[in-house]
Swiss-Prot record:
Reactions this protein catalyses: adenosine(1618) in 23S rRNA + S-adenosyl-L-methionine = N(6)-methyladenosine(1618) in 23S rRNA + S-adenosyl-L-homocysteine + H(+)
Role, per record: Specifically methylates the adenine in position 1618 of 23S rRNA.
Highest taxon listed in the record's lineage: Bacteria
An example Gene Ontology molecular-function term: nucleic acid binding
Annotated SUPFAM superfamilies: S-adenosyl-L-methionine-dependent methyltransferases (SSF53335)
Gene name as annotated: rlmF
Lineage, uppermost ranks: Bacteria, Pseudomonadati, Pseudomonadota, Gammaproteobacteria, Moraxellales
Pfam families noted in UniProt: Methyltransf_10
Subcellular location as annotated: Cytoplasm
Protein name, entry field: Ribosomal RNA large subunit methyltransferase F
Length: 345
């Protein structure tokens, strides 16, 4: 049974009557995404009273937080997860990625549309719900955000994998501590980092969809340069839409000597060759698991990587490929989806 968001604040526009296409044109979140407009701090503070310690008033007299304060952003995430997804315990180690929940939720809702339009078509065009839908999250991190959003929004089952033992242990603890997640999410350690699907997808496994938010930097230096730009943009956009702000700043600082102002371990933020190398490996390996997955999908943060990946997928003989654009304020990104079989259509 689908878990419904709790205490969602009404917005001025009837976002549930918008189409996803309209939302993208307007730079807005997916119509089913509950994180529309400004955060309702009164509601969120009721869900997590600790948030009151971090709430401030902006020059317009509106409640907000200091989005440059990693502790405040972390508590805001805890409040969002408690209020909208019923997650009572959520915490991550120092130095690990604290993700922007509104943007992460958008990915899941667009994937639900993809399934509704292709492999799980309902007469009323509603997204498929329930534990018969099994999703695989590649690189779940310590936060397990995609399994949380997907299981609590649509009732799906998730297998979540990562190459980092601390991430796996933390994500598993989050899921085991929350009754709503315990039976819905299984966390697995990838013991051979050179592989993405091998060791994770078993011979008897079938996943309706794979989701992935890949490392997007090729080196620590590139990650640091991106962080510098992000901090500049955070200052420049101060006072604008809060969902956009959290997408720029909602990460926890690490312990590295470089003193990066965002969270994320090496494995979360950068890998040799960057995003294109990781996704090239993912695409090639997906061919070996074509019979085990309905749709392979991934975020592609760099637009210049889309065409090379499309060309590669054509060479690999995929049966169908889609680019799903997402827009959140001034930030645009996209989902690349492909599959090798279309027998279910």
């Amino acid at each position: 049974m689908t878990s419904k968001p709790m205490n969602r604040r009404p917005t001025a526009n009837n976002h549930r009557n918008r189409s996803p296409e309209t939302a993208k044109k307007l730079g807005q979140l997916h119509p089913r995404n509950p994180h529309q407009g400004r955060y309702d701090f009164e509601v969120l503070t009721r869900a997590l009273p600790e948030l009151a310690k971090h709430t401030i008033t902006n020059p317009k007299g509106e409640s907000t937080i200091n989005f440059s304060d990693s502790a405040a952003v972390r508590v805001l995430n805890q409040a969002l997860l408690a209020n909208y997804y019923g997650v009572k315990f959520w915490d991550i180690p120092e130095g690990y990625l604290c993700p922007p929940i509104p943007g992460r939720a958008d990915y899941i809702h667009y994937i639900a549309d993809l399934l509704a339009q292709t492999t799980h078509v309902n007469k009323d065009n509603t997204p498929p719900t329930g534990k018969e839908i099994h999703a695989l999250d590649i690189g779940t991190g310590a936060s397990a955000i995609y399994p949380i959003v997907g299981s609590q929004s649509y009732g799906w089952r998730f297998t979540a994998s990562d190459i980092d033992p601390i991430s796996v242990n933390t994500a598993a603890l989050i899921c085991e501590t929350n009754p709503k997640l315990k039976s819905a999410v299984k966390v697995k350690l990838q013991t051979e980092p050179k592989f993405i699907f091998k060791n994770i997808i078993g011979r008897q496994d079938y996943f309706d969809v794979v989701v992935c938010n890949p490392p997007f930097h090729a080196s620590l230096e590139e990650a640091m340069e991106a962080n510098s730009r992000k901090q500049h943009n955070l200052q420049r956009h101060r006072g604008k839409n809060e969902n956009e702000q959290i997408s720029r700043s909602s990460t926890k600082p690490g312990n590295a000597a470089q003193n990066l102002n965002f969270g994320g371990q090496h494995k979360e933020l950068w890998s040799e060759g960057g995003e294109i190398a990781f996704l090239t490996k993912m695409a090639k390996e997906s061919q070996d698991f074509a019979e085990h997955v309905g749709w392979f999908t991934t975020l592609v943060s760099k637009s210049e990587n889309v065409k090379p990946l499309q060309l590669l997928l054509k060479q690999l003989g995929v049966a169908q490929m889609r680019i799903i654009e997402m827009s959140q304020g001034q930030k645009s990104t996209r989902i690349l989806a492909w599959r090798f079989n279309t027998d279910e259509e």
